[in-house]
Amino acid sequence: SYNSEELSLISHVEDIETHRTYSFEILSLYSLLKSGNKTKSIPQSYIPNTSIFDKIASLIRLNLFIPDSRIGWNYFAFKKAKKIITRNKIDYVITTGPPHSSHLIGQKIYDQFKLKWIVDLRDPWSELFYLKSRYRFNFSKKLNNLLESKVLENSDAIITTVGDRYHKILSSKVSNPKKIHKIYNGYDKFNFDKVPEKKPNKFNIVFTGVLSKNHNYEVFFEVLKIIS
């Protein structure tokens, strides 16, 4: 039920030991009911809300599956993780999200094994942009915030791809803000070593992320207008 798969990247990690498990994909059930095909992908960060079915599905998805609908993997992932940790001498565990439900796996591992735990937040959790534009019950918001607070507080380190304002928000949620660090997204330089340098007449700016009405990109266009 993931929208994009780049299977060619598997060759980059062939030397890394990988363990696969079963996962109960809640979104596969949505796809089956919606299109008759449970393998049909759902666009990232997209929650349709055009029909009665979509509205009900959105309400269920955001209020019953906390923190997200990928939580169907947690039972199987934790079961596998216990075997790996018991069999090997593991010192550190890193959980990355979204999906932020993966951090709940890390929480269970921390509770049982007391390993050093690093939480990697590729995107905000309770501040995730599409949560602001959808209706959620108060108990759903409180539970989501509670889970986030517990994960952040129990972790030994927190990594984000941005700093400044988001770090201020995170700092208010933990007793030790010094454990919050930023590591910017990077790229493999060798992929561009053989790309010839060009100086075209037109300059292209490409954004490959997600834009929504909750993002403030007006300043970008204002600056672009000034310098153009």
Predicted regions mapped to residue ranges:
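Membrane-proximal helix-turn-helix segments that form the acceptor-binding/catalytic region
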Residues: 79, 101-104, 108-112, 125-126, ...
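Conserved catalytic-core segment of nucleotide-activated headgroup transferases in glycan assembly
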Residues: 188-194, 198-228
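A short helix->loop->beta-strand "cap" motif at the edges of active sites that frequently abuts
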Residues: 113-116, 156, 176-179
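Active-site proximal beta-strand in glycosyltransferases
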Residues: 16-17, 92, 108-129
